[in-house]
Amino acid sequence: MKTVTVRDLVVGEGAPKIIVSLMGKTITDVKSEALAYREADFDILEWRVDHFANVTTAESVLEAAGAIREIITDKPLLFTFRSAKEGGEQALTTGQYIDLNRAAVDSGLVDMIDLELFTGDDEVKATVGYAHQHNVAVIMSNHDFHKTPAAEEIVQRLRKMQELGADIPKIAVMPQTKADVLTLLTATVEMQERYADRPIITMSMSKTGVISRLAGEVFGSAATFGAVKKASAPGQISVADLRTVLTILHQA
């Protein structure tokens, strides 16, 4: 299993890494959130660009990215436009989405981008290659806010991400029952033990799935999302509580 190193952070060894999401709508909001996050205990800062009002203006996006980078200087920055169809705030055409991610890569301000698996294989492959040429890592993602697919389907999607060149495959699914949480955990173990040659991130959302956000080290998920202020997805818990639990499980 190879690890992924971003700045000085090694993902895929030790306790799962904590990712927090910044979701400001304006550049003023983005700056104030980044300042508020500066003292929080996390490993990776995700900028959820789909919350940013001026997302279709590249200059505004890059100005905001620069502002974040000036305030949070030492942590890896993950650039994420979550599409409306996968639970995000706005919709872009495929062309706009790819152009936005390429602009982020070109900027030199971000360390990682999030690419949704179902954007289209050709577009995804080309954008992964482009990111890698610029030393930007790729988290490839899929989100189902309605249900939990069968374990075989979860594994298949994660394997597809790996085949398309993702540095870190990621999937988040919604449980309707407690058994659905076990389905996600079973799929995580199977992927991690049988197929993965790189770190993966998995989670079962909502309060029902919260155990999956805590027990990643046990089952094979290399990172988890926590909340500094407002949760970016259902079931997230505070970073302070998250770090405590992750450390307990790591040292057990």
From Swiss-Prot:
InterPro entries: 3-dehydroquinate_DH_AS, Aldolase_TIM, DHquinase_I, Type-I_3-dehydroquinase. The keyword Amino-acid biosynthesis applies. The active site is at residues 143, 170. Changing residue 86 to A: Very strong reduction of the catalytic efficiency and almost the same affinity for 3-dehydroquinate. It comes from the Bacteria. PROSITE patterns: DEHYDROQUINASE_I. It catalyses: 3-dehydroquinate = 3-dehydroshikimate + H2O. Changing residue 236 to A: Nearly abolishes enzyme activity. The keyword Amino-acid biosynthesis applies. Pathway: Metabolic intermediate biosynthesis; chorismate biosynthesis; chorismate from D-erythrose 4-phosphate and phosphoenolpyruvate: step 3/7. Inhibited by (2R)-2-methyl-3-dehydroquinic acid. Changing residue 170 to M: Abolishes enzyme activity and 1.5-fold reduction of the affinity for 3-dehydroquinate. Its EC number is 4.2.1.10. Keywords: Amino-acid biosynthesis, Aromatic amino acid biosynthesis, Lyase, Schiff base. GO terms for biological process: 3,4-dihydroxybenzoate biosynthetic process; amino acid biosynthetic process; aromatic amino acid family biosynthetic process; chorismate biosynthetic process. Changing residue 232 to A: Reduces enzyme activity 50-fold. It holds the Pfam family DHquinase_I. 3-dehydroquinate binds at residues 21, 46-48, 82, 213, 232, 236. GO terms for molecular function: 3-dehydroquinate dehydratase activity. PANTHER family: 3-DEHYDROQUINATE DEHYDRATASE (PTHR43699:SF1). Homodimer. Belongs to the type-I 3-dehydroquinase family. Involved in the third step of the chorismate pathway, which leads to the biosynthesis of aromatic amino acids. Catalyzes the cis-dehydration of 3-dehydroquinate (DHQ) and introduces the first double bond of the aromatic ring to yield 3-dehydroshikimate. The reaction involves the formation of an imine intermediate between the keto group of 3-dehydroquinate and the epsilon-amino group of a Lys-170 at the active site. This is 3-dehydroquinate dehydratase.
